[in-house]
Amino acid sequence: MAEKPEVLDAVLKETVDLENIPIEEVFENLRCTREGLTATAAQERLSIFGYNKLEEKKESKFLKFLGFMWNPLSWVMEAAAIMAIALANGGGKPPDWQDFVGIITLLIINSTISFIEENNAGNAAAALMARLAPKAKVLRDGKWDEEDASVLVPGDIISIKLGDIIPADARLLEGDPLKIDQSALTGESLPVTKGPGDGVYSGSTCKQGEIEAVVIATGVHTFFGKAAHLVDSTNQVGHFQKVLTAIGNFCICSIAVGMIIEIIVMYPIQHRKYRPGIDNLLVLLIGGIPIAMPTVLSVTMAIGSHRLAQQGAITKRMTAIEEMAGMDVLCSDKTGTLTLNKLTVDKALIEVFAKGIDADTVVLMAARASRIENQDAIDTAIVGMLADPKEARAGIREIHFLPFNPTDKRTALTYLDGEGKMHRVSKGAPEQILNLAHNKSDIERRVHTVIDKFAERGLRSLGVAYQEVPEGRKESAGGPWQFIALLPLFDPPRHDSAETIRRALNLGVNVKMITGDQLAIGKETGRRLGMGTNMYPSSALLGQTKDESIAALPIDELIEKADGFAGVFPEHKYEIVKRLQARKHICGMTGDGVNDAPALKKADIGIAVDDATDAARSASDIVLTEPGLSVIISAVLTSRAIFQRMKNYTIYAVSITIRIVLGFMLLALIWKFDFPPFMVLIIAILNDGTIMTISKDRVKPSPLPDSWKLAEIFTTGVVLGGYLAMMTVIFFWAAYKTNFFPRIFGVSTLEKTATDDFRKLASAIYLQVSTISQALIFVTRSRSWSFVERPGLLLVFAFFVAQLVATLIAVYANWSFAAIEGIGWGWAGVIWLYNIVTYIPLDLIKFLIRYALSGKAWDLVLEQRIAFTRKKDFGKELRELQWAHAQRTLHGLQVPDPKIFSETTNFNELNQLAEEAKRRAEIARLRELHTLKGHVESVVKLKGLDIETIQQSYTV
């Protein structure tokens, strides 16, 4: 051990070319053997070479904190702070220090909350991503074990197999050549072949084969590590960030317009004094900007991401949450996702093709062509049929094992029997095994008949073949292959798959089965799961189908209507995703293998299922840690709840901006009312503190896929904000210009006086604006009536605490610096009552906006035909014709005729009409059977009588 540091020092300084010297010299220089390192030696080398990972630059905590004050919304607040001490310094008054301090305090509070929450979210995300850290099979102390790739050191012996991402730079040892995808490193588009002695780079992907290798470089010393130092990381602006920017810009522009109008009217027209004008501008700046928006939305997303992880879905990309919320098509693997991937073989159904061989011998041959360790589901099922798994290698000596790969779709074992004769046995996809057989033409028809018979019962087929190798060399082709038998494999559906698919459809997510199995198996599984049997072979994707009923349909439409596809290869998955995206669908795709990576990357939401390969996980947006489809649907619901919280807040933020800008601008310009800027700061601080709790609010997920609709957000915000602004103007008019409130409620008057002391009026306006503005969140957070959908207790508690503080300030505060005076409990009660009355129509306004934006209201206004026709059921014939046409087209009986549909009608609406018609018919039938009134009406209709002339009473 004494000489090791010097030798390893040479390796550390890269003075030895380990990539090109002979493999034996590699072992000599690394002071290791083919039996691997000991755990002690590995630990010593870890202290020399460091962990096998790229160290990220540590960001300064202080600079990160300041970064939260560096965005367009914060810039506006910072401009307001400068205005408070620089511009608001005239008219015989000192600078507005209280507003300056208040603004800075508000900025610090928001930045602190953002910093703490993002730091917590970052720590949680790091812990979650640690669960996804790549693993490596490494030989230590003479035993193979799975370790984190980060603890690999030069000299370790590792195992590389299909789907693995190479964990470190290494030299290959004896074994079959690998197909390595180095496109991420070298730009080579095609996989390259690497044999024994060749070097492989960290970060490349194994596309085919299995082999052992010796690690020669780790961490920053790898080819990938050196390249990473030369490249700066790039931050891609996501859709979420664009939406955030758009909403922020809308609010800033609204404030700018209000300020420009105020400047034009106050100074050139009204000839107002300088200082009051600046104060009014500060009110719009401070009150209108949604300074908490980045914090609220980021915190909501981070908390939601953590909740998803608890449900078994780890989000690698935060913005995948909003895409998951909008997903309307999910292309799901069958095996392992819709089914258990726990295969069973019915020995009684085994179909033997070779003479003199029984079912037990077939099982033994299939077991020999299986792995004893590190098994897949098929290996487990086959070897599990033996009385003792050791029987699979009993009496033979293994020479060479060919692992499964997507190209050959089979495994094979070359072995020596007790007499020293060499044999080879193979199992795999029936077509591949059949192609090996020397008598393929004689048995092909029978093989396909058996396969179809199995498939009709939902059983997969596994072929087994055997050959002798008289040459006695593992490289030799051997004698003729003999097709031995077909084994039936049954993969039972998950107990919750059918219910989950039904839930998905109710949520507007269409689940399509994507399977590599036969069409008949796909249809049988679809039938059992209740997802439909409208499935097609993969040849239909290429327009090569011979089925005349679907040959006339465009491929895009075929994919959109299909319940699934069978016989699918990874390249077909990519095509399916591309076509669905072209039809404006938000598409999710599940995958587990290395060849699924392109489709997972192409999909809007790539989902790596439980036990997926490193390559699939790397390409995905979401990694599942639990098996089954139910995890995905639960993640969809959670994502929609997260999205709903963000959407609720953005509508609220826009509403408050419009409400503050329009309301205070009108008060300033009509009655020359100067509201104290400091009180707007108090409103902002209390509002922001309360609104932070919306990230944990109880919400109802949307029943349909969600997406950012900026027109809806802006329209709803402008209308609700405009309504609240007008109610404040009306309240001001009633309190200032009339004696309505004193006459009705017996409170002191706030009417206009000779001195026009606005102090009490300012307190009244403060309380009116504060309470109704914050109460608006209960309207924007609910889809139906706000008093029906129960909010989270934290939000309710925060609201009442904030408004209790606001009420106490309005009742008791006599702050000369803020120009307010207490109004007493009488006025406080009047204002709360006024705001309750103001609150009631908000839900109705929300419903009207939603109805108007849906387009249906405009159809009625523009067409005007329904209102003026004498027909009782206008357009009934056209609707019936459209529905019948849609049904015939959906079942492939008729080519779609675009002329028959109006611009506002589509297949989905017609299908919905059809479903509603079915439900109405069923309700009518049950009503006729089970109610006396229904029975009487049925008889009257059947006899052709007029019910008005029948003088008898009946009971409902």
UniProtKB/Swiss-Prot annotation:
BP GO annotations: proton export across plasma membrane; proton transmembrane transport; regulation of intracellular pH
Keywords per UniProt: ATP-binding, Cell membrane, Hydrogen ion transport, Ion transport, Magnesium, Membrane, Metal-binding, Nucleotide-binding, Phosphoprotein, Translocase, Transmembrane, Transmembrane helix, Transport
Cytoplasmic topological domain residue ranges: 1-65, 119-247, 296-646, 698-713, 781-792, 843-956
Chain ranges on the Extracellular side, renumbered to this chain: 86-97, 269-277, 667-674, 735-759, 814-821
GO molecular function: ATP binding; ATP hydrolysis activity; metal ion binding; P-type proton-exporting transporter activity
Gene3D superfamilies: 6.10.140.890, Calcium-transporting ATPase, cytoplasmic domain N (3.40.1110.10), Calcium-transporting ATPase, cytoplasmic transduction domain A (2.70.150.10), Calcium-transporting ATPase, transmembrane domain (1.20.1110.10), HAD superfamily/HAD-like (3.40.50.1000)
Active site positions, chain numbering: 333 (4-aspartylphosphate intermediate)
Transmembrane segments: 66-85, 98-118, 248-268, 278-295, 647-666, 675-697, 714-734, 760-780, 793-813, 822-842
InterPro entries, per database record: ATPase_P-typ_cation-transptr_N (IPR004014), ATPase_P-typ_cyto_dom_N (IPR023299), ATPase_P-typ_P_site (IPR018303), ATPase_P-typ_TM_dom_sf (IPR023298), ATPase_P-typ_transduc_dom_A_sf (IPR008250), HAD-like_sf (IPR036412), HAD_sf (IPR023214), P-type_ATPase_IIIA (IPR006534)
Catalytic activity: ATP + H2O + H(+)(in) = ADP + phosphate + 2 H(+)(out)
Family affiliation: Belongs to the cation transport ATPase (P-type) (TC 3.A.3) family. Type IIIA subfamily.
Subunit structure: Possibly exists as a homodimer or a homotrimer.
Function: The plasma membrane ATPase of plants and fungi is a hydrogen ion pump. The proton gradient it generates drives the active transport of nutrients by H(+)-symport. The resulting external acidification and/or internal alkinization may mediate growth responses.
NCBIfam families reported for this sequence: ATPase-IIIA_H, ATPase_P-type
Protein name: Plasma membrane ATPase 1
Organism: Solanum lycopersicum (Tomato)
Gene: LHA1
